[in-house]
């Protein structure tokens, strides 16, 4: 099964977890990266394809937002915004990227802190769409190891397959 969206490294997780290693990246996308785009400066982020930023041990704990009936994680949100700032400084344009999360409260928290052209939305709301860069905020971090929406394989497949050139996943390992 040939896919035409994402770099081979981004595709690898989804192929292994959901498609029994049946996905193949077309030659036109398998090696593409942010550094192929003019005026993007090489950095540790822009030179990568798939990054997992583990927040275990940071004290970034989820909280319940009663107003939105949803979860949020302030520390993780600050980290995602810092990562976005690093990408923007390296020349990544806001309309090339999106910040997504399974949780509406986290989406709201992020949306209030980014430039207007940087899209912020839920995983479900982003289904069928793609961007050059996706920053995925997983939110869940608690002492009992509860993962909530993260156990929904369909949602996680959608979340992990929206990026074309760079996927940054931020969460508690």
Tell me the role of every PLM-derived stretch.
Residues 96-98, 132-133, 166-168:
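Beta-sheet entry/capping signal
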